[in-house]
From Swiss-Prot:
Protein's recorded name: Polyphosphate:AMP phosphotransferase
Region (PPK2 2), start-end ranges: 269-491
Family to which this protein belongs: Belongs to the polyphosphate kinase 2 (PPK2) family. Class II subfamily.
Organism: Pseudomonas syringae pv. tomato (strain ATCC BAA-871 / DC3000)
A Pfam family of this chain: PPK2
One GO process term, biological-process aspect: polyphosphate metabolic process
Length: 498
């Protein structure tokens, strides 16, 4: 795979100087056009052999284009904060906004290669990391990202010659880093595993470009031209019409039973039983979150449900059991301008708690397959694709020790109507009812179908949905608390078996 990058590609100075002005002008123009469109973020992944010109090339790119629109990120040793989160959390936080370019050193490929080369894990774990990288990049590209992956290459002979030349030069020996010497000892393994990674992850939506790094002129022009070609192709790509205009009618089957129809909404608790069970479950939750085993876990609770189903009341009863320093409540509304400039999961990744912490999502990433689907705020392909993306997201969370509990609070139409009318009559509850609530009520069958599809496609063994019979608020609140406690205790029990 690397043979063509070891044959001595070179460009003389005259040819380089003649080609450079037009290339710089075209790159800057394409960069500005993409920034003005603000439809795509550009992600440039820098990998390869030490000393092959990675840093020098990125420095040139910052000179050729507007550096104010470029963010260079280096992912070296993980910080304590990063170690307390799922592995890809650090990359999601640093994604550039649409219209901007992010250049990533030490990215996910660097981490997986270093881990395998130095024996931190075996081939099976490397293959898992490769599959995870493919899924991440596919999702980013589906959300509009433009990904360039560069492998800067030197042959083993060229690398050793470079090190010897620099070592013997008193003025430039400082340019040799400890990583240079380290890689000179592991070159064969690094290239062997690098070839495996490139072969598995070079896709039409995010291909690898292998750059011979010996000649600076050739290296610089080649990278610049590849960037220009990709950026111009993105600018010339014909986008489909707005999803709000093209989405077809939803396939609603009003006469078919769904999981929601199987719920016994008459379930209830007496006031006396409620007080007893509520206090017991709150005490249980408080103890579970203080348990030393929580140091290996984080907790995420997702609350979805019909309007007026009592999500807020259930959340307050959960929070009442805890020290405010232990948890955060994240209400999810329509995305802000900054959030629209990112892939839709970005705003949720940023809120994932560190180990030992608890985050409550009042509405969540499931908006993509609920309100966005029903109201036509995204395309049909977007929400259909989202089921797999959400399952992958939640799998990454659980693999990192996050306990994910998901609640759908269900009420019937008559109960919702009564609660709406009550909110309109009581002054201190009036803020809870809006025109949108009444409008959404008219789409009850549409939402019922969307909820059924959501549960069918995203209730998994690792992150199952819990359907809460919420006509009786007391029953719902206790069931929510009990479910959270059971999920935590199951996670603690699994820890013992490891």
């Amino acid at each position: 795979m690397f043979e063509s990058a070891e044959i001595g590609h070179a460009i003389d100075d005259d040819t380089y100087e003649a080609a450079l002005p037009s290339l710089r002008e075209a790159l800057l123009e394409a960069q500005i056009d993409l920034h003005e469109q603000a439809k795509r973020q550009i992600i440039v992944l820098i990998n390869g052999i030490e000393g092959a010109g990675k840093g020098e090339t990125v420095k040139l790119l910052s000179e050729w284009m507007d550096p104010r629109l470029i963010e260079v990120r280096t992912f070296d040793q993980q910080t304590d904060e990063e170690l307390a989160h799922p592995p890809v959390w650090r990359y999601w936080r640093q994604l550039p906004a649409k219209g901007r370019m992010g250049i990533f050193f030490g990215n996910w490929y660097s981490q997986m290669l270093q881990g395998r080369v130095h024996g931190q894990y075996k081939d099976a774990v490397l293959d898992q990391a490769i599959s995870g990288a493919e899924r991440l990049e596919k999702m980013l590209c589906d959300e509009g990202a433009l990904i360039f992956k560069f492998w800067f290459h030197l042959s083993k002979k060229q690398m050793k010659l470079r090190l010897k030349t620099l070592k013997d030069d008193p003025l430039h020996s400082w340019r040799i880093s400890p990583l240079d010497w380290q890689q000179s000892k592991t070159y064969d393994k690094f290239v062997r595993f690098g070839e495996r990674v490139l072969r598995r992850t070079s896709r039409d939506y995010a291909p690898w470009h292998v750059i011979e790094g010996v000649d600076a002129n050739y290296r610089s022009l080649t990278v610049g031209r590849l960037l220009l070609e990709g950026m111009q192709a993105a600018l010339n790509k014909v986008e489909p019409e707005s999803s709000a205009l093209t989405i077809g009618p939803l396939a609603i089957h009003n006469n078919e039973r769904t999981l929601l129809d199987s719920l016994d909404l008459s379930l209830h608790l007496s006031k006396e039983d409620y007080q007893h069970e509520l206090i017991a479950e709150q005490a249980r939750l408080s103890g579970n979150l203080r348990d030393k085993r929580m140091k290996s876990h984080a907790l995420v609770a997702v609350f979805e449900g019909n309007d007026a189903a009592g999500k807020g009341g259930a959340i307050r009863r959960v929070a009442a059991a805890l020290d405010p320093r232990q948890y955060a409540i994240v209400p999810i509304a329509a995305p802000t301008q900054d959030e629209r400039a990112q892939p839709y999961l970005w705003r949720f990744w940023r809120q994932i708690p560190a180990r030992g912490k608890f985050t409550i999502f009042d509405r969540s990433w499931y908006g993509r397959v609920l309100v966005e689907r029903v109201e036509g705020f995204c395309s049909e392909s977007d929400w259909k694709r989202a089921y797999a993306e959400i399952n992958d997201f939640e799998e990454q969370l659980t693999e990192a020790g996050v306990v994910v509990v998901k609640f759908w609070l269900a009420i019937d139409e008559q109960t919702q109507l009564e609660r709406f009318q009550e909110r309109e009559k009581i002054p201190f509850k009036r803020y809870k009812i809006t025109e949108d609530d009444w409008r959404n009520r008219k789409k009850w069958p549409d939402y019922r179908q969307a909820v059924g599809d959501m549960v069918d496609r995203t209730s998994t063994e690792i992150a199952p949905w819990t359907l809460i019979e919420a006509n009786d608020k007391r029953w719902a609140r206790v069931k929510v608390l009990r479910t959270i406690n059971e999920a935590l205790e199951k996670a603690f029990a699994r820890d013992k078996k490891k």
